[in-house]
Amino acid sequence: MTILNHTLGFPRVGLRRELKKAQESYWAGNSTREELLTVGRELRARHWDQQKQAGIDLLPVGDFAWYDHVLTTSLLLGNVPPRHQNKDGSVDIDTLFRIGRGRAPTGEPAAAAEMTKWFNTNYHYMVPEFVKGQQFKLTWTQLLEEVDEALALGHNVKPVLLGPVTYLWLGKVKGEQFDRLSLLNDILPVYQQVLAELAKRGIEWVQIDEPALVLELPQAWLDAYKPAYDALQGQVKLLLTTYFEGVTPNLDTITALPVQGLHVDLVHGKDDVAELHKRLPSDWLLSAGLINGRNVWRADLTEKYAQIKDIVGKRDLWVASSCSLLHSPIDLSVETRLDAEVKSWFAFALQKCHELALLRDALNSGDTAALAEWSAPIQARRHSTRVHNPAVEKRLAAITAQDSQRANVYEVRAEAQRARFKLPAWPTTTIGSFPQTTEIRTLRLDFKKGNLDANNYRTGIAEHIRQAIVEQERLGLDVLVHGEAERNDMVEYFGEHLDGFVFTQNGWVQSYGSRCVKPPIVIGDISRPAPITVEWAKYAQSLTDKPVKGMLTGPVTILCWSFPREDVSRETIAKQIALALRDEVADLEAAGIGIIQIDEPALREGLPLRRSDWDAYLQWGVEAFRINAAVAKDDTQIHTHMCYCEFNDIMDSIAALDADVITIETSRSDMELLESFEEFDYPNEIGPGVYDIHSPNVPSVEWIEALLKKAAKRIPAERLWVNPDCGLKTRGWPETRAALANMVQAAQNLRRG
């Protein structure tokens, strides 16, 4: 029984973000569709070759996506919302981009599909839309074309397909309500057709992703798996693939399915290998997800070997990444600025492929010398002084309940804040960032590269901040922001100013579409050596009589959007960050900043996948926010911002944050989210986002007014704020000015009644 290895997927964007650049060039009309398609082909060929050279036996094909793999699946099934359909019924790459972005080089602009987080990761997918009586047919053959490409290059191909039950689970019903699971029998014929096409091509194994099987699914959904897979069996071998959690709670459902193998995430799940081996049918292959696809740490391969060695020779076995390597940067070897000791602790996607090759070889031969050698740096890290800071650990241990309580309740604070700020009804503001123009990015890059001295850099940033204040005053906004010209990324910026983080040059991972992020890496205990945001906030406030918000990224979001340490709990990391930022709140307040926004867009996405684990997470997540904010005086108004959230199931925790104002992303869901605030009788102030900043389309005054009137039916108008959904960093100034002018006009119209 020779053990093979494979990955569940590989990063798509390219080492130098070639895909991002090609997409954006095409969208801007600066390159042709053929040029874009060529970049995709080149990247796929390179990535297959790189995995093969690193020692991967079975290459994933179908993991590449032009925007998002769930959206690719929607097109495969012919699920195109009517507003995005071509008049002749055809589907092309612009159809896909219109669903994702609201517009493309061809076709009519229309509202983009809703976007939300892929399980509990930082990747986003476009939510499939379902309507009653919908028809499906094989429409977009990207998967088959890419399989042909890989076969022509002589690769050992393992196609990757998002499974039918998970696909339906991830979608939403539009219009007349019905049970979307009832569409299962309508989509299965398309899956059968795809599997038949793959069988024709001589494909042996297909990786069919059903990550919904790690969730606490309703019984009807669990029951749907058997008939679904009964319909799909027989054409090729199916590797039922799960990730992000364990499968033990749903193992009875899984073992009844007519598949030939199961992939389990042995990093994030608590499944016991011996127990899995005992309960799985003896002729099934087990794919052991031993290498973490979601982090950047070098694996202790001696531990991984010990975890799996007892079942070697007892059943067919593959070793694999825990999930797709999409969530990891591509190649550590191009990082030239990382300190050698710290660098030795990491492994990016290509190094993880190498780890899988080492593990496969050791399991096949029994020789573990190479594993011990590879694991030595990560074992040595446990005793490094760069990891442990006794002062931070002591401060954390001394936290009391008092440290997470504001001095007075919201009603008392609100009165003090009204007296201080004297804001009109329907106060207008933005979420924080303004367009990051080429000038701003060039300024930061020149400074970073040493081509610009500190004085000239600061003069340049000050000028961009001044322009942002002038723009906002001209537009008539009530509460201003400094625009964040000095910040490359809302998490990276804070990480750069906190001890305990390190940064990469090319550690990019895809967030959605062409958006990539370069997450900081938490390597040790976290502290704040000096104030971070005070100087620029104070400068911005000196330019205007209107209040300027201080802007902080909250502790849970910094944690969720960084690569965390694996040797301490997430709670410990979050509270260390909270203590560091608590000092920042105190310093902003002392500098005369009266409104401080602590963004927590990631609070909900950090939720464990199983509801039974939610309470513990929410308890420490809320406590971290409160530790951060509680130092503020009564007349300092604390705002928080959250995006892509469904709130109804965590409303208690949202209220427990005790922020004076919460701004939320609601425009894509047509104010649906406010339902939860209404039902809960949310006591504090709310700014429901009135337009979608992820789309370049400019909302009309009437559209915004209608949304605000809708909001006022649910929340008393005196507690409503008016703001966009999210920061405006990725937008251009022309559409930003136009959209904000319409937003301010809508608020003024409502004030006049």
Swiss-Prot record:
Cofactor(s) the protein needs: Zn(2+)
InterPro entries in alphabetical order: Cbl-indep_Met_Synth_N (IPR013215), Cobalamin-indep_Met_synthase (IPR006276), Met_Synth_C/arc (IPR002629), UROD/MetE-like_sf (IPR038071)
Biological role: Catalyzes the transfer of a methyl group from 5-methyltetrahydrofolate to homocysteine resulting in methionine formation.
Protein family: Belongs to the vitamin-B12 independent methionine synthase family.
Free-text cofactor note: Binds 1 zinc ion per subunit.
Pfam families: Meth_synt_1 (PF08267), Meth_synt_2 (PF01717)
Biological pathway: Amino-acid biosynthesis; L-methionine biosynthesis via de novo pathway; L-methionine from L-homocysteine (MetE route): step 1/1
GO terms under biological process: methionine biosynthetic process; methylation
Binding-site list for 5-methyltetrahydropteroyltri-L-glutamate: R17, E18, L19, K20, K117, R515, C516, W561, E605
This protein's name: 5-methyltetrahydropteroyltriglutamate--homocysteine methyltransferase
GO MF annotations, alphabetized: 5-methyltetrahydropteroyltriglutamate-homocysteine S-methyltransferase activity; zinc ion binding
Reactions listed under catalytic activity: 5-methyltetrahydropteroyltri-L-glutamate + L-homocysteine = tetrahydropteroyltri-L-glutamate + L-methionine
List of residues binding Zn(2+): H641, C643, E665, C726
PANTHER family: 5-METHYLTETRAHYDROPTEROYLTRIGLUTAMATE--HOMOCYSTEINE METHYLTRANSFERASE (PTHR30519)
Enzyme Commission designation: 2.1.1.14
Keyword check for Zinc: yes
Recorded superkingdom: Bacteria
Organism: Escherichia coli O139:H28 (strain E24377A / ETEC)
Active site residues of this protein: H694 (proton donor)
Keywords associated with the record: Amino-acid biosynthesis, Metal-binding, Methionine biosynthesis, Methyltransferase, Repeat, Transferase, Zinc
Residues binding L-methionine: I431, G432, S433, E484, D599
